[in-house]
Amino acid sequence: KVHVQPYARRRFDGLRADTPEVITEETSDGTPYTITRHILGSAPAKLPIPTPQCMELGQLIEQLEEMPAPDRFRRITHMLVDAGARDFTWVDPTPSKIIETPPAISFTVSTAKFEGRVTILYDRGGDTYVVELHRQNGESVELVDRHDEVYFDMLGEVLERLIDDGRWRQIDVSILDAKAARKRQAVPA
């Protein structure tokens, strides 16, 4: 016997993306209540980043969460989950500091294509993004690759080319019962 596990989109917490969301809210008098929310046809993977004050960082987060990956089955954030994205950091500047400290999201991935740190930062001058790949080299961090002038609608393609190894397409098959196969015998006619 075997167990076949087809691909399922996941969230950053490891749960399936179509898992119901449980939210606790309060009424106007402070009484807490719980809501279990199922969003039909949607399987979001929200980035583990709080709501930013910088509009451009908010737009980057929205684009990563809402725009489809090049395969059209996943969103860009699902591609990041499949690449093992973790250890998220972000730069959320005030509007006056946006040039000297550009908004950015950085995370670590581990795939067959690339293992290291990925940074997506906003270039205010060109109204584009810059995607950088960094690798730990002993005590120092070295810049491995840099892609300038990445428009928002190119983010998925660039990230797929740099970090997506396609392993998500492989169906997981595991053997449950390793009994010796019975020998078949011919039945006389």
Give, region by region, the residue ranges found by the protein language model.
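Eukaryotic intrinsically disordered, low-complexity regulatory linkers and tails enriched in Ser/Thr/Pro
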Residues: V4-P6, I105-F107, T119-Y122, T128
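Flexible glycine-rich surface loops and low-complexity tracts that mediate binding to linear polymers
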Residues: K1-R16
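Activation corresponds to long, low-complexity, non-globular regions
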Residues: G30-L60, S174-P188
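N-terminal secretory/membrane-targeting helices
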Residues: Q53, M67-P68, F73, R86, ...
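Intrinsically disordered, low-complexity regulatory segments enriched in Ser/Thr/Pro
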Residues: F114-V150
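Preference for solvent-exposed, low-hydrophobicity sequence contexts
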Residues: T19-I23
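Negatively charged, low-complexity tracts enriched in Asp/Glu with abundant Ser/Thr
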Residues: K46-A112
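Polybasic, proline/glycine-rich intrinsically disordered low-complexity segments
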Residues: S140-R184
